[in-house]
Regions:
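The canonical Cys-X-X-Cys-His
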Residues: 178-189
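Short stretches within intrinsically disordered, low-complexity N-terminal or propeptide regions
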Residues: 4, 26-29, 46-50
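Extracytoplasmic c-type cytochrome modules immediately beyond a signal peptide or single-pass transmembrane anchor
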Residues: 49-176, 199-260
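Short Cys/His-rich "knuckle" micro-motifs
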Residues: 191-196
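Bacterial N-terminal signal peptides
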Residues: 22-34
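N-terminal secretory signal peptides that target proteins for export/translocation
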Residues: 1-20
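Short, intrinsically disordered, low-complexity terminal segments
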Residues: 21-24, 41-45, 55-57, 75
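Ser/Thr-rich, Pro/Gly/Ala-heavy low-complexity intrinsically disordered linkers and tails
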Residues: 35-51
């Protein structure tokens, strides 16, 4: 009897390619230097948000301000399925604090200043999104730990059914010992295990200050976004910016930057 291993082989190839891509990005990052920081801008004076999209609100008893990866899974599981990433963003309590960066040196790269990588602060967790391109289907996490380390995780959208607690971690493994995050985030160590899936912490990194994109610029991109041409990108920007106050926030200055 001939056994066909092609599906497993292709899955392994994709995992290896993903890890090598992250590793290659880190090599580029090592050549970069720190730039200046722009002044923070706030959209706190924006008009009142419109009525919420049906279903894109946390039901009673479920927090719409998740502070941990586990609490985020609980919110996702409480929202209607299939759940889009824009709907999840809309469901989050306002005000939101964000930091946007146009750097392409990431496994979730920005598509220029018009579609930057956007970090959302839900202390002690930092989530990240990008409105278009590679990584636009991902919600990435860094749940902060002492000494500028963080627990890494990611969730792929749309979410079709309730997630297991281990779901944010089970796609990150490169092999039995390290994750795909370990190529860029040094000092990776196992912190715990859940449902047989290992969870790893590693060095937390912040974007280069000079790559910052202001909230004012993001608001402008939402205002001019053509929904007939870029429906998903417009939906992502609207999910983030269209439902209440969004303000800028800095990362801790003691945290290392991408590229040193």
């Amino acid at each position: 009897m001939v056994r066909h291993f092609r599906p497993c082989y292709m899955s392994w190839v994709l995992t290896v390619n993903r890890f090598l891509t992250r590793l290659a990005l880190c090599a580029w990052l090592s050549c970069l230097s720190s730039l200046g920081c722009s002044d923070p801008v706030s959209s706190a004076g924006a008009p009142a948000p419109p009525s919420s999209t049906p279903g894109c609100r946390a039901p009673a008893g479920v927090s719409d301000a998740p502070r941990t990866i586990d609490e985020t899974v609980a919110l996702i599981n409480a929202l209607p399925k299939p759940l889009s990433l824009p709907c999840f963003l809309e469901s989050l309590a306002r005000p939101l604090q964000v930091h946007a960066s146009y750097s392409v040196f990431s496994a979730q790269p920005a598509q220029g200043a018009r579609s930057p990588r956007i970090f959302l602060f839900q202390d002690p967790t930092v989530m990240s999104i990008v409105p278009e391109g590679e990584g636009a289907s991902l919600l990435e996490f860094g749940e902060q730990r002492p000494e500028f380390r963080s627990l890494k995780a990611e969730i792929v959208f749309p979410v079709a059914a309730a997630l297991d607690p281990s779901a944010p971690f089970d796609k990150l493994m490169f092999d039995s010992q390290i994750t795909t995050c370990g190529g860029c985030h040094a000092g990776e160590l196992q912190e715990s295990e859940i449902s047989g899936v290992r969870r790893f912490v590693s060095r937390a990194l912040r974007p280069q200050p000079g790559d910052r994109v202001s909230v004012q610029s993001l608001d402008h991109e939402l205002a001019i976004c053509d929904r007939s041409l870029e429906p998903q990108r417009c939906a992502m920007l609207d999910g983030l910016l269209g439902w209440g106050s969004v303000t800028e926030r800095d990362f801790p200055v003691g945290m290392a930057t991408f590229g040193g």
